[in-house]
């Protein structure tokens, strides 16, 4: 075969013309130390605070300490095979998690990867875990309720859409049970739920997921998990990841509810990271920015106005407000609410529900202490019927507590005092409620009406629970339409008052409890 020199030169020219030098600029550094999930990297001059650093083996770390000649970063995942001298790169990206409706009904880890063994995740994009909270002008006042299904909470400590209400108490006082029942109660309300489990046992979380599924609430819920066996970095970031998933619904004119269970464990994880990064410790060895840790998270829970939603969706959604309601949980030690983290979160939130171990052990469940529990903005969100009928409950309980303490020392009590004590005991008994049995607005209203109008005074204390159960069965059977009407409108007028009175008069006459 004979080669033509002209052809060869043309071929070479063609190849030269086609040759394209692709240059890739990236900021590269070297690991100088690895210990306890923390790496120190030399040479990353242009790294950002919170930036993802690419590590060998398709892993990454997050830059938290930017020092003069090195960067302190926390590894997201296993770090046993990392060694000094390994090369790492800047990615130019902040940590993002998948968001969207495809996450509903799924159990995911902090990074948004599914861990429930089901089909691959479908999502509508990614959202940064750290986001700036909506400004004052973009917000709207809280005036719509979130019904927890608990009589004691919805009557005395009402929660509104866009509110932050702290659930605080010692271990084993029913904090998680209250939050999970609030999720179960949203299954028909249209409110999307996010449950963030931080530092809990995997078996406990599996039980929660099973209960949500049994009660038909999992399809409406995203469960974000950072178990006790996972790294402190994943436990620290889990609430922010869950919040980003909740903001997806808020920014599109929908309502969402997020539970952080619990922020005490997140603060401990952050303290661990900060001490390993050699940051100076402060009170209780927490770093100086532990208040900011929780404030920047909880400020993202808000109710945004229709203009914000319209601008965010570029006009696709009009005339709708969005909300993200937060129920953070804090665990106290022996009822000490003056510790560092509890006082911080109390000052950030719009109210708190105190659960007490002595009430829990006395069989009063939910173990809410109405004297020191408060909702600062939820009162404006209560439905008309609940506002009208719940007013006397808090007063009755306050008077009962005062008189109960006094009556221990008094030998003879007048009739008025004895009547008040009896009424207080009946109301306390009436507010008891079993787990996984949330009540509708109409059911709560009927029970509160019975308490306020004296229908319980001649019912034995031990029979109050039976009275309530029989009453619920009776109205479901005889007055389903009225109950449906109250649930839909939340209104209270002379007609509804007369109907409730008629129901209770007829039911009392049957003596069927």
Swiss-Prot record:
Its main location: membrane. GO terms for cellular component: plasma membrane; proton-transporting ATP synthase complex. The record marks 373 as: Required for activity. It is a peripheral membrane protein. It is found in: Cell inner membrane. It is an enzyme of class 7 (translocase). It catalyses: ATP + H2O + 4 H(+)(in) = ADP + phosphate + 5 H(+)(out). It holds the Pfam family ATP-synt_ab_N. ATP binds at residues 169-176. GO terms for molecular function: ADP binding; ATP binding; proton-transporting ATP synthase activity, rotational mechanism. Disulfide bonds: none annotated. F-type ATPases have 2 components, CF(1) - the catalytic core - and CF(0) - the membrane proton channel. CF(1) has five subunits: alpha(3), beta(3), gamma(1), delta(1), epsilon(1). CF(0) has three main subunits: a(1), b(2) and c(9-12). The alpha and beta chains form an alternating ring which encloses part of the gamma chain. CF(1) is attached to CF(0) by a central stalk formed by the gamma and epsilon chains, while a peripheral stalk is formed by the delta and b chains. Produces ATP from ADP in the presence of a proton gradient across the membrane. The alpha chain is a regulatory subunit. HAMAP family: ATP_synth_alpha_bact. This is ATP synthase subunit alpha. It comes from Sodalis glossinidius (strain morsitans). The lineage of its organism: Bacteria, Pseudomonadati, Pseudomonadota, Gammaproteobacteria, Enterobacterales.
């Amino acid at each position: 075969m004979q080669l033509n020199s002209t052809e060869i030169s043309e071929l070479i020219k063609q190849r030269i013309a086609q040759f394209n030098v692709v240059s890739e600029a990236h900021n590269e550094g070297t690991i100088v130390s690895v210990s306890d999930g923390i790496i120190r990297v030399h040479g990353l001059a242009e790294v950002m605070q919170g930036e993802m650093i690419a590590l060998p083996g398709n892993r990454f770390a997050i830059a938290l300490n930017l020092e003069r000649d090195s960067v302190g970063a926390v590894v997201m995942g296993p770090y046993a095979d990392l060694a000094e001298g390994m090369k790492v790169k800047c990615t130019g990206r902040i940590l993002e998690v998948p968001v969207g409706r495809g996450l509903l009904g799924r159990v995911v880890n902090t990074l948004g990867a599914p861990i429930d063994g089901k089909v691959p995740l479908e999502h509508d994009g990614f959202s940064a875990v750290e986001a700036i909270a909506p400004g004052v002008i973009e917000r709207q006042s809280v005036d719509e309720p979130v019904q927890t299904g608990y009589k004691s909470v919805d009557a005395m400590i009402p929660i509104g859409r866009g509110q932050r209400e702290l659930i605080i108490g010692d271990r084993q006082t029913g904090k998680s049970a209250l939050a999970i029942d609030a999720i179960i109660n949203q299954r028909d309300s249209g409110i999307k739920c996010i449950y963030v489990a931080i530092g809990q046992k995997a078996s406990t979380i599996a039980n929660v997921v099973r209960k949500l599924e049994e009660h038909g609430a999992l399809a409406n819920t995203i469960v974000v998990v950072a178990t006790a066996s996972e790294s402190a970095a994943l436990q620290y970031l889990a609430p922010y990841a869950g919040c980003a998933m909740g903001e997806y619904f808020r920014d599109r004119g929908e309502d969402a509810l997020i539970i952080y269970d619990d922020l005490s464990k997140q603060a401990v994880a952050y303290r661990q990271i900060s001490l390993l990064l050699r940051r100076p410790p402060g009170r209780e060895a927490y770093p100086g920015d532990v208040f900011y840790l929780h404030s920047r998270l909880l400020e993202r829970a808000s109710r945004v106005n229709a203009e914000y939603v319209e601008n965010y969706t570029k006009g696709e959604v009009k005339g709708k407000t969005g909300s993200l309601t937060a129920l953070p949980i804090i665990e106290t030690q022996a009822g000490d609410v003056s510790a560092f983290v509890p006082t911080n979160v109390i000052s950030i939130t719009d109210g708190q529900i105190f659960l007490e171990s002595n009430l829990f052990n006395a069989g009063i469940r939910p173990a809410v202490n109405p004297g020191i529990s408060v909702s600062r903005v939820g009162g404006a969100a209560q439905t008309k019927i609940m506002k009208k009928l719940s007013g006397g409950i808090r007063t009755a309980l306050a008077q009962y507590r005062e008189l109960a303490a006094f009556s221990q020392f008094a030998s003879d009590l007048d009739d008025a005092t004895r009547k008040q004590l009896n009424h207080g005991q009946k109301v306390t008994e009436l507010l008891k409620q079993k787990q996984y049995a949330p009540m509708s607005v109409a059911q709560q209203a009927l029970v509160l009406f019975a308490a306020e109008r004296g229908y319980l005074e001649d019912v034995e204390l031990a029979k109050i629970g039976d009275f309530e159960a029989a009453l619920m069965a009776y109205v479901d059977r005889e007055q389903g339409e009225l109950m449906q009407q109250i649930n839909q409108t939340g209104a209270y007028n002379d007609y509804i008052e007369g109907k409730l009175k008629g129901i209770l008069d007829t039911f009392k006459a049957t003596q069927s409890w």
